[in-house]
């Protein structure tokens, strides 16, 4: 399996019993509605556990949670996913999240930064390259109008700047 090949599965749940307004239809409505609410609560709990493990760089815990079916894009109470809060210098962790389907282009709800902005700002070239190969966009500006290359330049990460300029030029 390639580094960015996504694993099948995740937390796909049957939402056929719910109409577009989210109300329940069908004979098993009470039971299914209760299960749906329970699922949302479980996913929220899983999102907290996954993001906490990712932020701490706990690769084994992240892997175990994903293998148990935790949605790789589940968010914590701040609305951030594991790939947004992960320990950026841990390339193995980034690869695992991406393999399980983490979305590299989800903007931070407050700053609009993508994980590539964070990797560029901190100078993590290997993580940045992996995110880019997984489809991360390099042309998205954060809420201050900065591109990942701007952040790398501000911090003096010359190798990151060179990489970003080269891939943008070759695109």
Curated annotation (Swiss-Prot):
Q: Which InterPro entries match?
A: Ank_Repeat/CDKN_Inhibitor, Ankyrin_rpt, Ankyrin_rpt-contain_sf
**Biological process annotations from GO:** negative regulation of cell population proliferation; regulation of G1/S transition of mitotic cell cycle
Q: What Pfam families does the entry give?
A: Ank_2
> Mutating residue 151 to F: what's the consequence?
In some primary melanomas and melanoma cell lines
Bias-annotated ranges (Basic and acidic residues): 33-42
Cellular component per GO, a single term = nucleus
Renumbered residue ranges of the record's region Disordered: 33-52
Tissue localization of expression = Expressed predominantly in lung and testis. In the testis, restricted to germ cells in the seminiferous epithelium. Not detected in premeiotic spermatogonia but high levels found in postmeiotic spermatids. In primary tumors, low levels detected in melanocytic hyperplasias. Higher levels found in non-metastatic and metastatic melanomas.
Recorded GO terms, molecular function?
cyclin-dependent protein serine/threonine kinase inhibitor activity
Swiss-Prot/TrEMBL ANK repeat ranges: 45-74, 78-106, 111-140
Alphabetically sorted, this entry's keywords are: ANK repeat, Cell cycle, Cytoplasm, Nucleus, Repeat, Tumor suppressor
Subcellular location, in the record's words? Cytoplasm; Nucleus
Q: What does this protein do?
A: Acts as a negative regulator of the proliferation of normal cells by interacting strongly with CDK4 and CDK6. This inhibits their ability to interact with cyclins D and to phosphorylate the retinoblastoma protein.
> Subunit composition?
Heterodimer with CDK4 or CDK6. Predominamt P16 complexes contained CDK6. Interacts with CDK4 (both 'T-172'-phosphorylated and non-phosphorylated forms); the interaction inhibits cyclin D-CDK4 kinase activity. Interacts with ISCO2.
Q: Which family does it belong to?
A: Belongs to the CDKN2 cyclin-dependent kinase inhibitor family.
Q: What is this protein called?
A: Cyclin-dependent kinase inhibitor 2A
What is the species of this protein? Monodelphis domestica (Gray short-tailed opossum)
> Corresponding gene?
CDKN2A
């Amino acid at each position: 399996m390639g580094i960015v090949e996504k694993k099948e599965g995740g937390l796909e749940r049957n939402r056929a019993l719910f109409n577009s307004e989210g109300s329940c239809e069908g004979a098993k409505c009470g039971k299914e509605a209760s299960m749906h609410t329970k699922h949302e609560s479980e996913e929220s709990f899983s999102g907290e556990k996954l993001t906490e493990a990712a932020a701490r760089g706990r690769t084994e815990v992240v892997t175990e949670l994903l293998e148990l079916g935790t949605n790789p894009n589940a968010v914590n109470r701040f609305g951030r996913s594991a790939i947004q809060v992960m320990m950026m210098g841990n390339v193995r962790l980034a690869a695992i999240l991406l393999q399980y389907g983490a979305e590299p282009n989800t903007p931070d709800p407050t700053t609009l930064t993508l994980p590539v902005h964070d990797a560029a700002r901190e100078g993590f070239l290997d993580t940045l390259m992996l995110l880019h190969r997984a489809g991360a966009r390099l042309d998205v500006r954060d809420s201050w109008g900065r591109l990942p290359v701007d952040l790398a330049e501000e911090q003096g990460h010359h190798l990151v700047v060179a990489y970003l300029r080269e891939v943008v030029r070759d695109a």
